[in-house]
Amino acid sequence: MLRFKELYQQKIIENLQKEFSYKSKHEIPQIKKIVINMGVGEAIADSKVINNAVNDLTLISGQKPVVTLARKSIATFKLRESMKIGCKVTLRKDRMYDFLERLVIVALPRVKEFRGFSYKSFDGKGNFTFGLKEQIVFPEINYDKIDTIRGMDITIVTSAKTDKESKFLLSGFNLPFYN
């Protein structure tokens, strides 16, 4: 099932070595982890909403997420310190490659009017962050059973030193880029 892990080991490492001519195999960039974050602002008014977000993220990632808490109170938003305001999950190793494969092959083609990712989404240190507006692009989510459509932020953390190396690495996994 882990075709993306095999793809990395058999082809992407070789292509990176040819392109950047690393001296050691430990210099070759790899994906360290994928962090999926779902902020749930509605949880301030209704604390049960956070359970639905946790269930959605569990189905999407295959791993139980951690509930995130507010760090400080903000009176304008009626937010108190340590209120539940979201959830996140960190994927590593096999689950990370499994999620990346489902994201590229199944979920991204289902996003409406999706042309690809901008190169501006890199942070300068080789990490790539993007957002999805709907959780229903994943086939694990049943449209009839969700309470509301929620978005999520996905961060792909790599060991690449530069954005150029990271772009080359992620392009090897067929992540669509434009520009």
Swiss-Prot record:
Keywords: Ribonucleoprotein, Ribosomal protein, RNA-binding, rRNA-binding, tRNA-binding
Entry annotated with the keyword Transit peptide: no
UniProt xrefs under NCBIfam families: PRK00010.1
Organism: Rickettsia felis (strain ATCC VR-1525 / URRWXCal2)
Alphabetized InterPro entries for the sequence: Ribosomal_uL5, Ribosomal_uL5_bac-type, Ribosomal_uL5_C, Ribosomal_uL5_CS, Ribosomal_uL5_dom_sf, Ribosomal_uL5_N
Keyword Iron-sulfur attached: no
Assembly and interaction partners: Part of the 50S ribosomal subunit; part of the 5S rRNA/L5/L18/L25 subcomplex. Contacts the 5S rRNA and the P site tRNA. Forms a bridge to the 30S subunit in the 70S ribosome.
Protein name (Swiss-Prot/TrEMBL): Large ribosomal subunit protein uL5
PROSITE patterns per UniProt: RIBOSOMAL_L5
Biological process, per Gene Ontology: translation
A Gene Ontology term for the protein's cellular component: ribosome
Gene Ontology molecular function: rRNA binding; structural constituent of ribosome; tRNA binding
Its biological purpose: This is one of the proteins that bind and probably mediate the attachment of the 5S RNA into the large ribosomal subunit, where it forms part of the central protuberance. In the 70S ribosome it contacts protein S13 of the 30S subunit (bridge B1b), connecting the 2 subunits; this bridge is implicated in subunit movement. Contacts the P site tRNA; the 5S rRNA and some of its associated proteins might help stabilize positioning of ribosome-bound tRNAs.
